[in-house]
Amino acid sequence: MDDKAASPTGKMQFETQPAEYRHWTLSVEGEIARLIMEVEPFAGQNDKIELKSNSYDLSVDIELADAVQRLRFTHPEVKAVVVTSGHDRIFCAGANIYMLASASHPFKVNFCKYTNETRLAIEEASAQSGQKYLAACNGATAGGGYELALACDDIVLVDDGSSTVALPEVPLLAVLPGTGGLTRVVDKRKVRRDLADAFSTLAEGVKGKRALEWGLVDAVVPRSKFADAIAERARKLAASAPQMERGPGIELGPLEPRLSDRAIEYRYVKVDLDPKARTADLTVRAPDSIPKNAAEAHAQGAEAWGIRAARELDDALLRLRFEHEQIGIVLLRTEGDRDKAYAAGEAMMGLDWIFRETRLLWGRVLRRLDVTARSFFAVVDEKSCFAGPLFELLAAADRSYVLDVEGVAVRPGTLSGGALPTFNGLSRLQTRFLADPKRADAVVRAGKEGPIDAGRMAELGLATVLADEIDFEEELRVAVEERASLSPDALTGMEASYRFAGPETLATKIFGRLSAWQNWIFIRPNATGETGALTVYGKPDRPKFDWRRT
């Protein structure tokens, strides 16, 4: 399979806009938006694979992710979003099976990770931006289609005697629902364990009345009354949204990165690639100026550093995942005016909706970094400005290498006190100092007092290695070469285990348990071997299993 989305450059395109959507229609009327899924069968990543029955591939989910983010920035006045299908009697059949069967293992993993991040963004929009989601399941709702519904606040299934909700992956394909389905059924909807077990082994799914009794949906409505019921529930959902600062919105323009075999360049972010060494330098530049107030922030719109730099970093991370699989180590660097980077972070704590959404955007991007399967080393030297939101890059890194010379300093701000939580619900500093939470508070207090120099960084526990000018480059070189020699599989598992110490949440269970099992199952012969269920799906052959339990 060609794992790259169609584009003039041959590179993947993670940006889009409503006028370019091929699979979704976004409309807004006052406080209520409608997202209608009507997948164009031969307009996916691979035009040889037909996306039947409103099934999706990455191109479909890229549009969904764009719509979710665009609603928050361009239409903050929206309080309820109705997600439904433009097809009669089919809501969504989930991820396209033939796409998955023909995709490489790394692509499968990154595809599922991306779809999980999009569903979590929907839930965050509900919890933090006051935009509630209603799944209007007007037909069969299976696999990833039901997982999309599970991310919504309210699920309504049409009661027509045939429409079902289903998670058929285990009985049909010998894999797991890859977008959080199992976790949300029991953790979010709190379906009884035995019923959840039965549900997830019923390939045909569960119809209306039973789906309601089991807690799989919130309402079932006859087809003749469905449209009116959805409209009424959407109005009630909008009325239940919290009172908060909203609008007017801003437009999200294109990023237009410059792409080559050795670099990915944006206005504030640059990735220098060294394919031979399997390393990359990811540098984020501090702002040249920051808005003094909300009016200036609105005037700058999506071109403001806080929004644009975060979007650029997000796009860069996705390109590293999908286009540069063999880059295993990323050196995180920053450059520019440290004071302005710090001030930009403090401005994000403002009350206006645009500051709130900028702050939440940085949170999503940093969490995408947290679950990106790369080794991240922060490099703190004379050019660095790890301050404000950029300090979180250091806090997110697996290690930090600090040059011990005068002038080298970092400066965490208010954001690092909990405004940008990881998936475990804690700040990165709280996760770092799990044994003594007061140390996290001490770091934030120190940053508010002024820059923290290299020696003080070591005292506060912010430096993995502190080295002088003579040893610094050699220490870093040896560490990178050593890391590059280790198994990427083992490193991914080790890093994921260490990055989320502390409490478990829905998200950590999805990424740390469900996704980990799914990634293992994806390479097992029972799923993807020559006679595995995913391989022979749609063929006359029956799957042949290795019956040993492991």
Where are these regions (language model features)?
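Glycine-rich beta-to-alpha active-site loop
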Residues: G86-H87, F91, I122-L173, F199, ...
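Catalytic binding pocket for nucleotide-activated donors in carbohydrate/polymer assembly enzymes
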Residues: L403-A419, N424-T431, G450-D471
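Well-ordered mid-protein domain cores that form the structural environment of catalytic cofactors
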Residues: I97, A101, P106-I122
